[in-house]
Design a protein with these regions (language model features):
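Bacterial N-terminal signal peptides that target proteins for export
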Residues: 1-9
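Repetitive helical segments and hydrophobic/amphipathic motifs
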Residues: 11-13
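N-terminal signal peptide c-region/cleavage motif recognized by signal peptidases
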Residues: 15-19
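Boundary at the C-terminal end of the N-terminal hydrophobic targeting segment
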Residues: 20-24
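Sequence context surrounding c-type heme c attachment/ligation sites in exported
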Residues: 26, 30-62, 68-144
Length: 144
């Protein structure tokens, strides 16, 4: 019985390995697209609940807001790594203007980082959402 189990496991492992190799390795550009999409997905996952609090759709929780603001501030430093040359491939929502004017895009990303950092700092001591709404709005505008 142990031998049959071992053979079955070996067959499954061989099949999985063969399928994985058949799919081919992603190119650096494809990896960059996946990376930046993942980062933006995590940013959105943290930004969404803060937006819900700002809109009054969910109750304000100062600790949760501060945690999410801190995460967004950190995450805002990551996306640029995913915008490498020739990474305008596959399914991506990245606008063509990014590559047409990379310096402008980098400046906008720096603004996003700055505004997200200010929000994280303000959220550390805020006890009401109204105190955070103006800075939250600036982060949202910088993210467009």
């Amino acid at each position: 019985m142990k031998r049959q189990t071992a053979l079955s496991c070996a067959a499954v492992l061989f099949t999985v390995t063969a399928v994985a190799h058949g799919a081919g390795e992603p190119t650096p550009a494809e990896r960059a697209v996946g990376y930046r999409q993942s980062v933006f997905h995590v940013i959105a996952g943290n930004f969404g609940p803060m937006a819900g609090m700002a809109k009054g759709e969910i109750p304000f929780d100062a600790k949760a807001f501060a945690l999410r603001a801190e995460r967004v501030a950190f995450l805002s430093t990551l996306p640029l790594e995913g915008f490498i040359p020739d990474s305008r491939v596959g399914k991506t929502e990245a606008k063509a203007e990014i590559w047409d004017n990379m310096d402008d895009f980098k400046a906008k990303m720096e603004t996003f980082q700055t505004e997200a950092g200010k929000l994280a700092e303000a959220a550390k001591t805020a006890s009401a959402i109204d105190a955070l709404k103006p800075q939250f709005g600036k982060v949202g505008q910088a993210c467009k």
